[in-house]
Regions:
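Conserved nucleotide-sugar donor-binding subdomain of glycosyltransferases
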Residues: 65-102, 109-110
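Active-site-proximal region of nucleotide-activated glycan assembly enzymes
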Residues: 121-183
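Donor-nucleotide binding loops and adjacent catalytic segments primarily
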Residues: 185-192, 196-261
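A short, glycine/small-residue-rich beta-strand->loop->alpha-helix junction that serves as a flexible
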Residues: 1-13
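Structural motif
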Residues: 101-102, 164, 202
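Conserved nucleotide-sugar phosphate-binding/catalytic loop shared by glycosyltransferases and other
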Residues: 3, 21-82
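An aromatic- and histidine-rich active-site surface loop
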Residues: 38, 103-118
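Short, polar loop motifs at secondary-structure junctions
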Residues: 31-37, 107-110, 168-173, 230-240
Length: 261
């Protein structure tokens, strides 16, 4: 699992529920770790399978933690190539030691490179919304040709050796057999399906980069009467940072997030 994306972690939890309900066994969960982020407690508590961490390439944020610093990220990852080779060998060893029949890859780059270099025998299936980028009918917003080519190239790297790519989408799209792409709905946990919606009177969201809290606070100063509850995974912060009666930042907690949603 690519540990950078909280969405990949929650999708893995959803898949776990479905697999266990069908009588399958999950022999291990490998997560690419990053010094910039920590694994949320809700994932570690609810995955209920052995979790193994390995060092994986990641994008470093700028000083204000609002966006990716491309130059810093490239230099950082180049200097750590020897560690990533160790991670590739570790992934291969864990696949063999657990005797897994199927490897499910949630957009982790090193899994694709493991299948390129060491060719594990276990069948691999990839799951992520990003595999829509490879679908022939997917229409991108206008942006640079180089950016699109880079994004598609990275996505293909994660799926090297896979027999199928499950592209998550709320919209129905045809299968693309030549690319091994099957479009499926997002994986929803049973807790979401069991939740009873009610009317709310606040804005709700998740900050991938905690630096954007500055923009939230700025908007709040202009609209002080609008209640807002935002979630982040900012290190060394308490469970709830209450700015005032109308603005709170919560540490990422899946149960609380679903309740507010």
């Amino acid at each position: 699992i690519q540990g950078e994306g909280r969405g990949h972690l929650t999708q893995a939890l959803s898949l776990r529920q479905k697999l266990m309900a069908e009588g399958h066994e999950i022999v291990g969960v490998l997560v690419g770790k990053s010094p910039a982020r920590r694994l949320p407690d809700f994932f570690l508590n609810k995955i209920q399978s052995p979790v193994y961490l390995f060092e994986s390439p990641n994008f470093l944020p700028t000083a204000k933690n609002k966006q990716v610093s491309l130059m810093r990220s490239v230099l950082y990852n180049v200097l750590r190539l020897h560690k990533y080779m160790g991670s590739i060998r570790y992934i291969d060893r864990m696949i063999r030691q657990t005797d897994a029949d199927v490897v499910v890859n949630f957009y982790e780059l090193l899994t694709g490179l493991t299948y390129l270099i060491l060719r594990p025998k276990a069948t691999m299936v990839c799951i992520a919304h990003q595999y829509l980028f490879l679908h022939p009918d997917f229409v991108f917003p206008k942006q640079s040709t180089l950016s699109l080519a880079s994004l598609r190239f990275f996505t293909r790297l994660t799926a090297i050796g896979s027999v199928k790519k499950l592209a998550l989408s709320f919209r129905k799209m045809r299968e693309a057999p030549l690319g091994g792409i099957v479009v499926v709905p997002p994986l929803l946990r049973q807790e979401v399906l069991d939740a009873v919606p009610s009317n709310g009177s606040y804005l709700h969201g998740y900050l991938l980069n905690s630096g954007f809290s500055e923009e939230i606070r700025s908007w709040h100063s202009r609209h002080p009467s609008v209640p807002m509850h935002f979630f982040w995974d900012k290190k060394d912060q308490r469970a709830e940072v209450k700015i005032d009666d109308c603005l709170s930042f919560h540490q990422l907690d899946d149960t609380l997030f679903l309740r507010y949603m």
